[in-house]
A protein has these predicted regions:
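Active-site beta3 strand of CheY-like receiver
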Residues: 54-60
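Receiver (REC) domain active-site loop signature in two-component systems and cognate sites
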Residues: 65
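A Lys-centered signature of the CheY-like receiver
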Residues: 115
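Two-component/phosphorelay signaling modules centered on CheY-like receiver
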Residues: 21-39
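Short, glycine/charged-rich "phosphate-handling" switch motifs in NTP-dependent
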Residues: 110
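Non-catalytic signal-transmission and effector/linker regions of two-component phosphorelay proteins
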Residues: 1-13, 20, 120-134
Length: 134
């Protein structure tokens, strides 16, 4: 699968905000294998710093993280005056309750997947969401 490229011809950039090193490695390998440039943050606070400092095309966000959870990360980012406030966000978590889905929507997620997720799902949702801005 070839990533959709912006007008300047560089690969699309994805920020993974996830505390699990294994999950970060999995998403990075899947997305880099599809031609995307990937950066990582270990929690919501680090994610905010990176999202506000560098241009990205997509956020992949876990919910349960130390220092700042994924919902708080998205809420804070969505309230910012930065271009990052409109980045599409894919929440991937182990939480499968309907109230978690509603909380993700309220926080500003564009889509919500429950772990475990397949490589094909990660690639497909990334490709679709990078064509969308909030």
């Amino acid at each position: 699968m070839t990533p959709i490229e912006p007008a300047h011809g560089l690969p699309k950039r994805v920020l993974i905000v996830e505390d699990s090193s294994l999950a970060r490695l999995y998403y990075r390998n899947v997305l880099e294998g599809a031609g995307y440039h990937v950066d990582q943050a270990m929690n919501g606070l680090e994610g905010i710093e990176k999202a506000l400092a560098e241009p990205f095309d997509l956020l992949i966000v876990d919910v349960n993280m130390p220092k700042m959870d994924g919902f708080s990360f998205l809420q804070l980012l969505r309230k910012s005056d930065s271009d990052a406030a409109t980045l599409p966000a894919l929440v991937i978590t182990t939480e499968a309750e309907s109230e978690d889905l509603q909380a993700a929507r309220t926080a500003g997620a564009n889509f919500y997947l429950v772990k475990p997720v397949s490589e094909s799902d990660v690639r497909a949702y990334a490709a679709v969401l990078m064509g969308v801005r909030r």
